[in-house]
């Protein structure tokens, strides 16, 4: 994964088209969602500080302040047990929520815009601009956004959902077994804050070791964490694998390369046939 640790976690669209959105069943029990939000407030740091040096060797300190916004289910518009000052309901604060989502999609554009423009029609199954599709996806009920701001500028964010997913359990290549999982959609760090381990800290320590392991205690048959990643994002894949993620049983598999004959000289060219994306998962028994 790149140093900004961006992750192309497009669940419904990357798995061929938008049909996967209906395939994924969100965990809609309000008490569990409340507890899940409280875990996010508890496990993600309220601020992240890092130091840099300028060309003269002088140290500067950046402090990123946390903001959490969630897209509620229809039956969880009011969640009394969650501190509204620390966790904002998108439906109750739509103006602010739209500002946050717009900043998030702009950061995604800087990192992955070219990929989305090339693959949008395949991913979303329509001809709309990829940003329009992405913003609609980003408003899916159940999504949680943990954002970090540097004086009003988005420095980093991650988004994820407590849901159910198939194709993760060993032997379930046909997507017949559904298990609770945290599905990671995005992890992005702005260029001004790269190189300080922020993305890894959010993914490994806050989400996996923090939120996911504690979710395991409250959710029967909880599997762990899953995500999707573009197949050509080798840096992202190396990081995920270093953290213990592996290609899920139901993930598209690498295809055998094809051999094409050149038009002149009778030569041959080996053409790789990787899928558009892979599904990675981290099991937490």
Curated annotation (Swiss-Prot):
It is found in: Nucleus; Cytoplasm. It catalyses: N-terminal L-seryl-[histone H4] + acetyl-CoA = N-terminal N(alpha)-acetyl-L-seryl-[histone H4] + CoA + H(+); N-terminal L-seryl-[histone H2A] + acetyl-CoA = N-terminal N(alpha)-acetyl-L-seryl-[histone H2A] + CoA + H(+). Acetyl-CoA binds at residues 187-189, 195-200, 233. The record marks 186 as: Essential for catalytic activity. CDD domains: NAT_SF. The keyword Nucleus applies. It is an enzyme of class 2 (transferase). Substrate binds at residues 116, 163-165, 185, 228. Its EC number is 2.3.1.257. One of its GO terms (cellular component) is cytoplasm. GO terms for molecular function: histone H2A acetyltransferase activity; histone H4 acetyltransferase activity; protein N-terminal-serine acetyltransferase activity. InterPro entries: Acyl_CoA_acyltransferase, GNAT_dom, NAA40. It holds the Pfam family Acetyltransf_1. Residues 88-274 form the N-acetyltransferase domain. GO terms for biological process: heterochromatin formation. The keyword DNA damage does not apply. Keywords: Acyltransferase, Cytoplasm, Nucleus, Transferase. N-alpha-acetyltransferase that specifically mediates the acetylation of the N-terminal residues of histones H4 and H2A. Belongs to the acetyltransferase family. NAA40 subfamily. This is N-alpha-acetyltransferase 40. It comes from Saccharomyces cerevisiae (strain ATCC 204508 / S288c) (Baker's yeast).
